[in-house]
Structure formats: structure tokens, C-alpha cells
Amino acid sequence: MHCLVILGFLLGSLVAFSWAGVTTQPPPLIRTLSAGGDIGPQFDVGKTKEPEDAEFWHNVGLRQLEKTIKQAQRVKEDSYQKKARNIIIFIGDGMGISTISAGRIYKGQYLKHGYGEEETLVFDDFPNTGMAKTYNVDKQVPDSAGTATAIFSGSKTHYGAIGMDATRSKKNGQQGRVQSVMEWAQKEGKRTGVVTTTRITHATPAATYAHIYDRDWECDTEVPAESVGFHVDIARQLVENAPGNRFNVILGGGMSPMGILNASEVKTTIFEGPTETICTRGDNRNLPAEWLAHHANDTVPPALVHNRKDLLNVNVKKVDHLMGLFRNNHITYSIAREAGEPSLQEMTETALGILERGDESNGFVLLVEGGRIDQGHHMNYARAALHELYEFDLAIQAAVNNTDPDETLILVTADHSHAVTFNGYALRGADILGTANSHEKNDPMFYETISYANGPGYWDHLANDSRPQNSSNMWMPLKHFTAEERAAPTYRHLATVPRKDETHGGEDVAVFAYGPGSSLIRGVFEQNYLAYVMSYAGCLGPAKDFDDSCEDHKDGQKDRPLDKPNPKRNGATVVGASLIPILTAATAAILRGRGL
């Protein structure tokens, strides 16, 4: 008998060892020839992988939500059940960790608050933080269209896609559509709005209302012949279709895609790069006029404004629908803003005045984008980019000051990072935009604390057209540039690889959260999870019925005890039994009946 037991034990151990040996092996490596001729290892992926469409990412989002809630329940924490009447999501476009750190110092030095390093940004004090993985379905390093779709709709997608999942088609404008948090909010009777310093048709704001194959199709003239009749340009979608034509607030740049060019627009400072180009309409339509006509029968007439003075004169206690378009293209960088252009803070305060009215009971959802942080980095304009972050911080402070912390969930994050570095061994209090090693007198080459992996700054700093033997002679000494030149917003910091447009960075981005539901932000998660945080905390969209907390909140009941069974989640696992995210019966039911 003992021999049989020992034999069974040995056989069982052998099977277990063999199984473990198989399942713990890393994916097989294959070697491929890259376009540049270099051979590098890549993982063999995609052969048995399920399609990463909206249903796939819906599953991922709900699993992360369940995992996070279980973690809270294990430590008897119930703050995750608190519900938000209002939601504000701040997107610092391109605001990676290096930008946040450098921007914090820039703020302190700009305001002359000590050395700079000890300064704080408003969102530094938010109680909950996490890290979001930003990759697109088809790219390790993402773009703003795919990331914004993930944030607002809960589905990761292809690079360049807006409001559509990975099944999108150039010849089918309905295929792969996903709803955004703005659509979810409007179904619950909430007010909605979008504020940005970019064109209102640019990638991030467009992802709140548009569904289109390519982010560049902002005007009718940009839609290729093969897609005409299937896809409608982004600007038209804003005024023709919900949720865009039901927004209470639309503030930003982009008059040209909307069909109302200002021929006398002033440009005091000339910025360069692809971001400064803009499309024009070919159908001669005046879309703001059509927007006004759409709201002509409103109880209170809509307001259309084009300058700072008119914006600040809007009666926010009466106006229900406001559109403000302030430039043909993007609103000018804040460091060189033209007369008559509002600040992001002013636009945010005006938006909140309209959205958060005392006589309204359903609340609101608002996007505020600091969009030109990204565009400054693309041109290696470090000073312009960091000043945009400072303005972004002021807008966040305005939101904190003008909302109820017990009713408003505020999320601050980036859609992606940038290839910008904060390097060297600069002395404490050294100018963040200055040199890192000027105190080292024997160093043969001074270099700046902020530099870029790639971008147009390469050509500005290159000593000559050939690569010399001594790499230290490859770059022009910084003394070649005058102090005035280096202080200009158009000064480009050095980039080590030549590109007309600096690239994004692929590292995780930080998420800062404040208010009811903010405790759902913890750890590292896929970026699309943010949509599920807003859905669950705001009682809207696909996670509204994830458990009974929204019904309890609606009925004015006390939070459900942690050990109370949830009838909507039949078959749910015992609380705290496992931190491994699994799909419960209720979650599966939501997947079947509430697809994005």
C-alpha cells in the first residue's frame, strides 16, 4: 500500500513538473529581418490570439474592474462604491513622466518658488494614482487617436482609428463602431462638453464624438475617394450626429475644418512643423451656422463666440449650448498666445459654469485637453511644451476650485508619452531648460538637461553634414546660440536622430484620481480600463450594472455591506478568494447584452 502511494506521488510529481516545465517556458523566439537590415529577436505572436475587437477589450476592462474591487474588498475598503455625479477627465496630450517631472520644476522656476524641484503640480496631491499601458492594437508606441478611443470608449484599436475598434473598414462607416463615455452620459441625462487647445476636430476631442477610419479625415477634402459615401468627415460628425450635436460646450480651435476661415488672423510668432498645417473644406458648408440652426428652437438661444472677450461675457447661468472656435488651426501656444485668445483655464471655468448648474440634478461629463504639450514636443520646443503643462495645471486647479469633491470624479492622465529625456547631473536649482553640466569646467562639451531621442532639433544642432571621428565635434557648442535664441519659444532642443516630427514614447503613463470612485485607480492596467472606471463610478455605460452600487446610490440607500450577496452576479466567487481576475456569470451576461 505504501509503495502504491509513493509511486502515485512520484507519478503525480512528474506530471506536475512536466506541466510546469511546458507552461512556464517563454514564447518561442523567431528571428526576422527588419527594414533596416538588422536582425533582432521578436516574439511569435498572433497565431492563436483572439481578435482584439471591442468585445475583447470589454472583457479586459470588466476583468480589471472586478480585480480592483476584489482588492478593495479584501482590505475592507468600500470607497470604491462611492458614485460621481460629475466626471472631468483631463488629458495632457503627450504628458509622460519625464514631462511631468520637468514641468513641475519649470512651474516652480517660472513662478520663482524656490529652486523648482520642491514645487508641486495640483494633481500631485490627488490621493490615488496608477499607471496605464498605452500601446495600440497594432503599434507598441501609440498615437492619440487609438489611445483616446481606448480612454473614452473602453476599446483599444488601431493607430489612427477614432471611435472604431480593430475591425474598422475604409468602405464601411458602421463597422467596428464603439460608443464613447459622452454617449453613455447623454443617455443618463447628463450634460456634456469638450474643451481643448487643439482643433476641436483633432484626435483626442474627436474620439469623444466621431467614428472614422482615419484621424486625418477632419475635412471633406481629406476623405479619400474609396471612402466617400461610407465615411463622413469629423467636422460634419460634430454638428450632424449625436453625441457631438448634443454637447453643451464645445471650446477650442479649428475654424478651418468647420468652414469659417478667419482671413485676417494674426501670427506674431511663427511655429513650424506638420502640426501647423490645416485642411480646408471643399463643400463650402458653414458648420457653425448649421450648429446654430440645429439649436434654434432651444429654450435659451445657443451662443457662438470667436474671441476671449465674448467668451467671458457668456451668461453661463442661462446658456445651455456654447460653441467657441478661436483660431483657424490650434489655439496658439500659451507662451506666445495672441491677443483675443482665451486660456485653457478660462475655457474650463466657462464650461463648468454651464455644465454645473445648481438647478441641474443629473450632473455632467467634461473632457479638458491640454493638447499642445504634445505638439511642442513634436517640434522639440521644450519651453513651449512645459509652459503648456503649466497652463494645464492652472485649468486643473480651476476644476478643483469650482466643483464639489464629494460629487466630482477628476481624472488626470496622458494619452501617451514622448521621446524626451530629463538627464544629466545638473545642480539643484539649475534652470530646467539650461545645461546639465556647465558647473563641470573641464567637460569638453556642455549639454542641455532636456534633450530628445529624435526630431527636427537634430539639424539645428548639427555641426556639419558629415559624422566626424570625434563625436563631441558632431554638435555645435551651445555657446553658438545666444541667450535670446535659447529663451525663445521656437528654440529646439537637441535631438540625436533626425526626424521632421519627433515621435511619441511607448512607456506607461500616470493616472491621477480625485473624488468619488478615485480609489479604482491603482496599480498598472490597460488604458481602456479608464472608460470602465468612469462607467462604474458615474453609473453610466457598460459597467453601470456591474453590481448593485448604482441602484443603492440612486435609491439613497447606504452602501451595501461587503458580505451581502449580489443577485446580479450569480456564481460570483467568494470575496477575497483570489486576486486572479476571472469572468463571473454576471460579467459574462454583460458581455453578451451590453457590448460596446
UniProtKB/Swiss-Prot annotation:
- Disulphide bridges, residue numbers: 539-550
Question: Could you confirm whether the keyword Magnesium appears in this record?
Answer: yes
Q: Which UniProt keywords apply?
A: Cell membrane, Disulfide bond, Glycoprotein, GPI-anchor, Hydrolase, Lipoprotein, Magnesium, Membrane, Metal-binding, Phosphoprotein, Signal, Transmembrane, Transmembrane helix, Zinc
Q: How does it sit in the membrane?
A: Lipid-anchor; GPI-anchor
**UniProt: Zn(2+) 1 binding residues:** 374, 378, 504
- Spell out the reaction equation it catalyses: a phosphate monoester + H2O = an alcohol + phosphate
Residue numbers spanned by region Disordered? 548-570
Q: Where is the composition biased (Basic and acidic residues)?
A: 548-566
Q: EC annotation? A: 3.1.3.1
Cofactor comment text: Binds 1 Mg(2+) ion.
**Propeptide per record: which residue ranges?**
571-596
Give residues annotated as binding Mg(2+). Answer: 93, 202, 204, 369
The record's listing under PANTHER family reads:
ALKALINE PHOSPHATASE, ALKALINE PHOSPHATASE 4
User: What family is this protein classified in?
Assistant: Belongs to the alkaline phosphatase family.
Q: Quote the function comment for this protein.
A: Important role in neural and renal epithelial function.
The entry's protein name is Alkaline phosphatase 4
State the organism named in the record: Drosophila melanogaster (Fruit fly)
Give the source lineage, highest ranks first.
Answer: Eukaryota, Metazoa, Ecdysozoa, Arthropoda, Hexapoda
